[in-house]
Every structure is written in structure tokens, then in C-alpha cells.
């Protein structure tokens, strides 16, 4: 190669080297900015101190559970309940699958030091003396999931290899989370919940009592276990709102049955009409001797919905709580209620403004009185349903 050729080759190689460096620098400059949502450990580089420090021999932190141990809702329910945009319920459930049942509270006694055994026994109660405790025997695992607890209740529990041994077991205590709804599991029935536990504006610090009024879907397929749970809850009366030819109760022996038919397809007139039916329904609700009651139509959503709406409203529940309860039907198999929420629920709330009263609760009272429900009976309902309320 001549001297001239060597110079030319050197210049070409130099240009190629500079081109590569330039390209690399351009690629580095064009990197997207760091993700602002990343955690500190993701967005910050590791320091020299961190690299050279002694290894951490402590146990790694466990991930926080998706649902707190004191909350009986499923993860999907929990996320929906704590989503401030509660009207966006179809993000979680669309009324096509059975998702309305609670997960319950897990009682895990695997760390209690019990010996290995063929079976285990757990006892739980709402008091530290274990008065009227529930005893569950024959458990093959060292845990048990308890269902249908009340919001905010105390729960005491202990375990052993048998009932006698359990009485000497370690006593655990927790307080159930207070955020509603109080949805329940009744085998063979969908869309079951107690309307209690919500705040009431009728009295400072007031709440809707739990265990008085349950809303459910049709109980036609209720099982023996479901019937037993109805009786365990102390329910005394069933109110069936379906079409007359569908009212085939009673469904549970020992529970009084009353059919108060509000025909299907009457959605546009349910606020203005059916005076006699509403009088009968609210007379039953006012009768403390008939409580607790469970009320249903077919889906436990629309006819059941307006009765529950009026009961919660007249008892001082807030709009957001009443709306959340109404939309929870989406977690059942009874179809989405998002369109009904707009066409019915919101209209009920708006139409109440035409009635006398300074508050929505008093406007709802005026609506009931316009149906022929005596004002004294409305006050009886309030005293019965709202903790701490006394009629003036």
C-alpha cells in the first residue's frame, strides 16, 4: 500500500469511529425521562455505600395483603368499595357472575403451637367470655374462615385439637372493619346484604342498626344450609314483591311470609303509584315484633331497590352510601344496574325535592306520608332503625 493510500484509509477509519461515537451520544440523549411513578428504589441509582455495605440478614418484609385481615370483603369488592368513583362499578363487575358473596374473616391458628392432629376445633364469639360461642369441629387445616359477621363488631376466637382443648387455647381478638356494605353468604341466594352500618344524619354519631333489614334476590333456589343461616340470623319475616304468579312462598319454615306484589315492568310509575303496597311494606318494617325482615323481588334490585332507597333516605343515610349499596347489585348475577341508576335511582332522589322538608330525610318522610303511611309510623321506624334516635 502506498503512503497516499495509508493516509486515505486512516482518514476513513477516523470518520467511521467519530460516527459511531456520535450515534451513541445521540441515543443516550434521546432516552425517555425516568418514570415519575416509580418508587425510590426503582428511580434512584445504588450508592457506593449500599454496594459495599454488609448484606441485610433480617427477614424480608412481606407484601401487604390486598384486603386487610379485619375486612370480610373479597379483593374485588374491597377495591370497588374504596374507589371514590363508585359510579364506575362496571370496572369491577357487570352483573353477569356471582361475585356478591363475602370472603369472610380468616382465623389462622397455625402459629398457636398446636400439635399435629387429625382434626382441629375453633371457637369464636362477640365477647371475651365466649358466651354463646360458636364451636366448629372437624377442621383438617389450622385455619377457618368465618362468614356473616357484623361491621365493626368485636371478634374473639381460640382453637385446639378438640372443644375442651380449645377452651385453653390462645385467645385472639380483632375488630371487624366498619366499611359497608355488610354483604352476606346465604347458600342458594344471590345479592344478599344487610342495609345497616351506614351513618345517619338524624342524630349526631348515629348509625343504621344492623341485623334488622336484609335485601336479597329471589330465594327460590335456597338450600338447606341457606335456610339454616336465615334462621341463625333470627329473620322472622319475608316480604315478596314479585308478580302475583311468582309469589310461591313461604320458602323457610319458621319465617312468616307476606306477598306484596309490585308488578314487573312498572318502573316508570313506582315513585308515583302503589300507595297501598308501600303502606303495607312500611307497616311491616315498623313492626318490631316482625323483625328482622328480608325483602326481595326477583333480582333484589329495582322493586327492592326503591323500598330500600326510601328506608335509608328517611333514616338519614347519605346519598353516596345509598348509591353504593344500590350499585352493589352489579356483583350479583342479576344484571348491571348502571342504566337503572341513571333512569331510576337518580330520578327518585331528584323527585323528592318536590316534597316538604328541610332535609332529604324529611322529604322522604313526606313522600311516605303522601302514600298514606302515618307520620307516627315513620317516627317508629326511625327510632327502631337508627341508633340513638328519639322522636321529638
Where are these regions (language model features)?
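Bacterial N-terminal signal peptides that target proteins for export
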Residues: 2-11
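Bacterial N-terminal signal peptides
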Residues: 12-20
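Detector for intrinsically disordered, low-structure N-terminal pre-sequences
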Residues: 19, 45, 50, 133-135
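Sec-dependent signal peptide cleavage junction
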Residues: 20-37
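Cys-dependent protein tyrosine phosphatase-like superfamily
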Residues: 27, 31, 54, 59-293, ...
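Intrinsically disordered, low-complexity serine/threonine-rich repeat tracts
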Residues: 33-60
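Residues at the beta-strand->loop junction immediately N-terminal to the Walker
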Residues: 296
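Ser/Thr-glycine-rich phosphate-binding loops at phosphate-binding pockets of nucleotides
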Residues: 299, 303-304
